[in-house]
Amino acid sequence: MTDKKENKMREVKIAKLVINCCVGESGDKLTKAAKVLKDLSGQEPVFSRARYTIRSFGIKRNEKMAVHVTIRGDKARDILTRGLKVKEMELRKKNFSNTGNFGFGIQEHIDLGMKYDPSTGIFGMDFYVVLERPGTRVARRRRATSRVGNNQMISKEECINWFKTEFEGNVY
């Protein structure tokens, strides 16, 4: 049997990149945030609704309050690279989960190379990256669904090593 590093089924890749922009209120501000995400990703964003009513914050149940977009493939890698350049290719160890995912936030969307528009304003956003190995589709498919083995799961250490090798990033 070949070494684990040479095995094609052991390669780690980006499954998806989710960019979330939570405004906290519906209306014109949320529409502007959706426009920013559409310009960034080239895809139509989806609105998220509040789960509960919180009177002290002025949030009603089912009120639109955030917008997010899911990006896959090469476009996800390009946008992730732009986001990591804003963070100077440095992430904290806390940013990595035990299941092989990581996330980080940026304060201003104009740092990604987008042009500033005074009528739109400035929005911060969260980047969430889901990593996977080939063969994880067996857990998501509709017919003959089965479990992914523990050897095929991505650990926190493997995720950090992948980040360091792919993006030459630092983890502190």
Swiss-Prot record:
Record InterPro entries: Ribosomal_uL5, Ribosomal_uL5_C, Ribosomal_uL5_CS, Ribosomal_uL5_dom_sf, Ribosomal_uL5_N
Any single biological process term in GO: translation
Alphabetical keyword list: Cytoplasm, Nucleus, Ribonucleoprotein, Ribosomal protein, RNA-binding, rRNA-binding
Highest taxon of source: Eukaryota
Locations listed in the record: Nucleus; Cytoplasm
One Gene Ontology CC term in the entry: ribonucleoprotein complex
GO molecular function: rRNA binding; structural constituent of ribosome
SUPFAM superfamilies: RL5-like (SSF55282)
Primary location recorded for the protein, binned into one broad class: nucleus
Gene3D superfamilies noted in UniProt: 3.30.1440.10
Pfam family, one: Ribosomal_L5
Keyword check for Ribosomal protein: yes
Family, similarity comment: Belongs to the universal ribosomal protein uL5 family.
Summary of the function given for this chain in its UniProt record: Component of the ribosome, a large ribonucleoprotein complex responsible for the synthesis of proteins in the cell. The small ribosomal subunit (SSU) binds messenger RNAs (mRNAs) and translates the encoded message by selecting cognate aminoacyl-transfer RNA (tRNA) molecules. The large subunit (LSU) contains the ribosomal catalytic site termed the peptidyl transferase center (PTC), which catalyzes the formation of peptide bonds, thereby polymerizing the amino acids delivered by tRNAs into a polypeptide chain.
NCBIfam families: PRK04219.1
Complex formation: Component of the large ribosomal subunit.
UniProt name for this protein: Large ribosomal subunit protein uL5
Origin species: Tetrahymena thermophila
